[in-house]
Every structure is written in C-alpha cells, then in structure tokens.
Amino acid sequence: MLLWLGHLISHAGDAIYMIALPWLMLELTGSKSLTSFVATSAYLPAVFFGLIAGVIVDRYDRKRIMIISDIARALLVTVIPVAILFDFITPLLIGCVTFLLSSFATFFYPARDSLIPHITNPEELSSANSAITISGQMSHLLGPLFAGVGISIF
C-alpha cells in the first residue's frame, strides 16, 4: 500500500513536470527550439541509461535505489522555484534539471518493477501489478490536468 501511494504521488509529479518545464522554457525564452530541447532532454536518459539501469538495479539494493532516486528528484524539483525566486533561472538550468529528473526516473522505475514480486505474496502479484499500472495511467491522465490548472493560476 505504501509503495502504491508513493508511486501514485511520484508518477503524478512526473506527469506535472513533463508539462510544466517545457511550458516554463517557452514562457522564459519564447523559443520553440529551446522548448523542444527541454522536451527532448526528458527522454534522452532512457536512451543513455536504460540498459545500464537494469543492470544496476539487479546488482544493488532496489529499495535504496528507489529512495535515492525519489529524494534526488524531490530536491531537483525544488531547484526550479528557488531559481525563479532568486531570479537565476536559465534555459540551461531548466534543461539540466529536466535531464537529471528523467535520469533518476530511469533508475527508479526498473527498481520498483523488480521489487514488487519480492514484497508481494505470489497470489497477490497480479493485483499489485494492476494497481501500479492503473495508478500510473491515472497519474498520466491527471498530472497534465493539474499542470494545466497550475499554469493557468500562475
């Protein structure tokens, strides 16, 4: 239950920043090219680290990888509002934060997926996987909605 709730919150945050950071870049620069750069930097870590992430997850403590990844992502997300508050937000900072957020996610999700069978009874594995999948889909659906509401307010 705790893993599911954490996943729901984490996944919703991912969906929000996938909308909010490109929007912020567009607002900051007006450049469609730089906005595309931010969107691309969100997907590059899967290409660069996808295969090695699986190996690392198999060799090291999955729970620790998940915790480190989520703490790192939480800290990275705070960089953007702090940079805005102190007026040192730059396109490079937004791109780097986006890349790093996605990099940590590239390690988090395989760790989570491989941990589920170890913390779930075999007869509940299908239900656990279904709950994780459904919450992920709901987050992908609701995250952009929340991002849009947040953007319209600010």
Could you describe each region identified by the protein language model?
Residues M1-F154:
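Alpha-helical transmembrane-bundle signature of multi-pass membrane transport and export proteins
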